[in-house]
Design a protein with these regions (language model features):
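Conserved glycine-rich cofactor-binding loop
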Residues: 14-15
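Conserved glycine-rich Rossmann-like NAD(P)H-binding loop of the short-chain dehydrogenase/reductase
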Residues: 28-44
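Rossmann-fold cofactor-recognition segment
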Residues: 47-62
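Hydrophobic positions on the long internal alpha-helix
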Residues: 67, 84, 123-127
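Substrate-binding pocket helix/loop in short-chain dehydrogenase/reductase
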Residues: 94-101, 105-110
């Protein structure tokens, strides 16, 4: 008897580590729901396990709410086994210096906190029931 297919939700999936994470879980036959500000490359979407991509700006609370609603509609009654918060931002100054407490604008810091802290918090809360059903984990 085979195990039911597990489902992963991954943010920041359009390139780099996110794209590699999709490949890793796809090779293990997980169904994958992704989110990024940009559409992923077309060759990625040919993967049969990459089942649903939602374009969303996770800095914006309304966009997150819309994303959660659409993803939950796609999930239906199925459980969620993993939420990987890969989307993030670490801006640099014009001289390639990382944002620090003595440099950078407060608006940049607000954006960093919205994306790197509040978005994962909102997503964990938004998918809590689906994650509980799947005994899922949040990364």
């Amino acid at each position: 008897m085979s195990q039911p297919q597990k489902t992963l939700l991954l943010t920041g999936a359009s390139r780099g580590i996110g794209h590699a994470t999709v490949s890793f879980f796809s090779e293990r036959n997980w169904q994958i729901i992704t989110c990024s500000r940009e559409s992923p490359p077309k060759e990625c979407l040919r993967d049969p396990n990459w089942s649903h991509h939602i374009t969303a700006d996770l800095v914006n609370a309304e966009s997150i709410d819309t994303f959660v609603k659409e993803a939950k509609e796609f999930l239906g009654e199925r459980p969620l086994h993993g939420l990987v918060n890969n989307a993030g931002w670490s801006p640099k100054s014009p001289i390639e210096e990382r944002l620090g407490c003595l440099n950078g604008s407060l608006d940049a810091w607000r954006t960093v906190f919205e994306l790197n802290f509040f978005a994962p918090l909102r997503l964990a809360r938004g998918f809590a029931s689906s994650l509980t059903k799947g005994k899922g984990s949040v990364v």
